[in-house]
Amino acid sequence: MKTFILLAVLGLASASVHQHKIVWRESKKMGMIRTGQYPAYLEYQRNLRAVSPNVLANLPQNVNDFGDFEYLGNITIGTPDQGFIVVLDTGSSNLWIPGPTCKTNCKTKSKFDSTASSTFVKNGKSWTIQYGSGDAAGILGQDTVRFGAKGDSQLSVPTTTFGIASKISADFKNDATDGILGLAFTSLAVDGVVPPLINAINQGILDQPLFSVWLEHRGAANNVGGGVFTYGAIDTTNCGALVAYQPLSSATYYQFKAAGFKLGSYSNTKTVDVISDTGTSFLGGPQSVVDGLAKAAGATYDDFNEVYFIDCAAQPGTLDITIGTNTYSIQPVNYIVDAGNGQCLFAAFPFDFGGFGPSWILGDPFIRQYCNIYDIGNKRMGFAPSLQK
């Protein structure tokens, strides 16, 4: 009995809460719009789809366009630590970073050297992952993964399986990141690999089987503070009182039901599946609904850039999303974004999942307005007002 009590106390003592500070950086998409290069990139994407029309069909990761992320975090892998910059992505589930055999498109990337890590365990199984924009391939390995930069307080997760890329597509070539850290469920992961955070929960490393995300407003310069991911607890420093929880309709993505979208005179009350996605800098939804919201805001669609331009001084009112019995209102400061050169964008895009999965992506404009609480253990999402400084 004494042994059992001692083990229980030790177990409680080992569980913890970790805060992972992130930085904001202008997305590749926004940079290309600002410099007039985005139409050429869109043409490249159209040509890619024309050559391989079935490549993106029915893929669980096709929600992701990694030209569209804006918030980045540091991780380390191995013993001693090797550092990497990654997208912290709730819209996918796999962790991968480049390895030393990745040459094309990897010249500016940090690469994981398995021979330099005393805790590395060879797996050898090959893997390939295809996103809505971009792909990567290589072999799997196992090592200790730590959330946070070297020298910071880190969440350390031993025996974590991850991808070591020998090839990445040109989509990732000029990104400010080395790889992707997926935070969604194992059921979404390629090859059924247990994601690092799920692995931490399975090992009892966290106080609670959840994490919360607070995103700051978009920065005025790259590499400034962008927010905090809190693992194992709700962030009560940067987030207000919980509004409500909403059960997940699918524990793959963080997918749940929304019952309406409204802005000004326009409203749509169809109940749809939506996902919370930290890796998408805009809101994404059906063409007809996004068009209606944009028109109500006074935004105009630009076919050349495939975006909605809006007057930077516009004050159209809140964009209201009904989830459960509550209405969540996004202020214009979070859905009107500066594209440079005196231009601003209505931060939404037409999105078609092809009949599979969610109808809407609730990206950074929603998460900047409301802290999102990813309650993995209870398979539900929670929302609390962001306490922006």
Curated annotation (Swiss-Prot):
The EC number(s) this enzyme carries: 3.4.23.-
Keywords on record: Aspartyl protease, Disulfide bond, Glycoprotein, Hydrolase, Protease, Secreted, Signal
Chief place where the protein resides: secreted
Pfam families xref list: Asp (PF00026)
GO molecular function, one term: aspartic-type endopeptidase activity
Tissue expression summary: Expressed in intestine, muscles, pharynx and hypodermis.
One GO cellular component term: lysosome
Disulphide linkage map: C102-C106, C312-C344
Modified how: Glycosylated. Has phosphorylcholine-substituted oligosaccharide N-glycans.
InterPro entries attached to this UniProt entry: Aspartic_peptidase_A1, Aspartic_peptidase_AS, Pepsin-like_dom, PEPTIDASE_A1, Peptidase_aspartic_dom_sf
CDD domains: pepsin_like
Glycosylation sites per record: N74
Places the protein is found: Secreted
Gene Ontology BP, a term: proteolysis
Residue ranges occupied by any Peptidase A1 domain in the UniProt entry: 71-384
Leader peptide range in chain numbering: 1-15
Active site: D89, D277
Known function: Aspartic protease.
PANTHER family membership: ASPARTIC PROTEASE 6, BETA-SITE APP-CLEAVING ENZYME, ISOFORM A-RELATED
Family per record: Belongs to the peptidase A1 family.
Name of the protein: Aspartic protease 6
